[in-house]
Swiss-Prot record:
It comes from the Eukaryota. Its main location: secreted. This is Disintegrin mojastin-2. One of its GO terms (molecular function) is toxin activity. Expressed by the venom gland. Monomer (disintegrin). Keywords: Cell adhesion impairing toxin, Disulfide bond, Hemostasis impairing toxin, Platelet aggregation inhibiting toxin, Secreted, Toxin. It is found in: Secreted. A motif (Cell attachment site) lies at residues 51-53. It comes from Crotalus scutulatus scutulatus.
Amino acid sequence: EAGEECDCGSPANPCCDAATCKLRPGAQCADGLCCDQCRFIKKGTVCRPARGDWNDDTCTGQSADCPRNGLYG
């Protein structure tokens, strides 16, 4: 939602302050296929394996999202 950096619905998330819905100090992310232990996963790490004629989708190192590369193998 607007103004939220993370989903504050779960107080158990160590990356997100449930009271403010903001990332905790030092955290880059709180969830996502390219987020691990509150940090972005390094560039080139497979976040979604190849399927059919499509290549692997990989993390960018700049975001917690796993972008679709849109490339055929």
